Amino acid sequence: MEISSEILTPATTDKHPLIGTPLVVPIIICIFTGVIGGAAYSAVVTVSLPASLVLGGIYGLVFAVLCHRRAVSPGAGLIWGLGFALLLWLVVRAGIVPVIAEGMSAIGRVDFLRAQFPQLVAYVLLLGMPLGIVLGIWGGLQVRPTQAAFSFRRALVGGGLAGCVGGWVFGRWMDKVDLFPVLGGLVNSHTRASGLAVHSLVAIVIGASFGLLFQRDIRGYGSSLGWGMAYGILWWFLGPMTILPLLQGRPLDWSYQHGSALFGSFVGHIVFGLIVGLTYAVADRLWVGFFTDSDPINREPEGPGARTVYSLGWGAAASLAGGLLFSLVMLATGALPRVARLVGGTSPLLGFVVHLVISAIIGMSYGLLFRREAPDKGSGVAWGLLYGLVWWFLGPLTLYPILLGGSLTWTTQAAGLALPSLIGHLMYGAATALAFIVLERRHDEWIRLDPRLAAREVRLRRPIGTPAPALWLFVLGLGVLLPILLG
């Protein structure tokens, strides 16, 4: 299920059209941006200003050297920036600092990691985000013949529509917890109607910015979920953790205690991001299909109906491996009787059957969403882990309590109780994705016999060199880490 057939690859040359040594320009830009970020970091986290300036400049230099060829657009640069910011925090604040302070025994201690939570927010917002966007803007100005054309109108319309849909869903939870009057206070009107208007406007703006940033990176419905999830996490840091208190005239509070109090908003932003990503991908595919796509020569070797049936079948078959692995976790934690409650029973055997049916449905959805996303088995496992994480947020924290007649349980208590299920969801996603790509590749072997069809198949797959690795690091890292730290 591809969104576009263009190849998205980094430039094949390092040469800038105007400057003989192109690396000098991004290095200067990133050092300057890193120094500014270091100054802001010093002011917010209250550490030594000279040290922050030097470290910010060094980080900007390293980021420019490593990512100047990969940050081919502002969106790609942003994802690389977020991934490297999390990596920096893991190495420095979660690795080196604990060892220096208390020795090797301090590594991985939750209390120590919680104490470093303000630095995590600062690294993401003050270093990763600005460095990524600035370097991506520079990269987007370079001439790359193989890069897909950008449509400003398509990005705004599709993104705005996605923001409307995501905002409507997120707004249901916000209305339940009475947050609209709080947003209405930003325009001096503490009413539900004014808060709803502010929320809707912000959702549309975020959706439109998603389209502007990531139009060239969104190739399939599955990967769009990942990009949307990453953008939702970023906006949780940026919105309720930062912009909202500043607009209300309150000091910034990036402590883990404040983050824990906003855990419901964290899950809500993830769900919002998932809906924005998927809705944008659908809208973008429809736009391209109706107004852009025309390729009478390079026809698909199979019709859309056959491709859909194959994807559903492979997904259902692959889910058997993931579902059986997940059932081991459920058996160990005694979760099968709770699953049986979905159909009015309590038997572990009934729960196992219901679990396999749900696994097959999710596996079929994986087949529809993620076909042609992975160029190799390693990439397939990464997408599978991400999809398993997606269903941990959508399943036990969102849909399961609703199906039992309850309400959303976006609380740290519910997340803590569901942590064993998180392990099971990750195992399920990885095993299902690995089995799926094996089945998919076995079927596609006959296509590779024709050089023309083989070349088209390669062109339709996500190429190596996109920001996907940084996306996996950022989403999987924070998607697993934050429920533990904030719980």
Language model features: what each stretch is:
Residues 2-487:
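Juxtamembrane/disordered regions of integral membrane proteins
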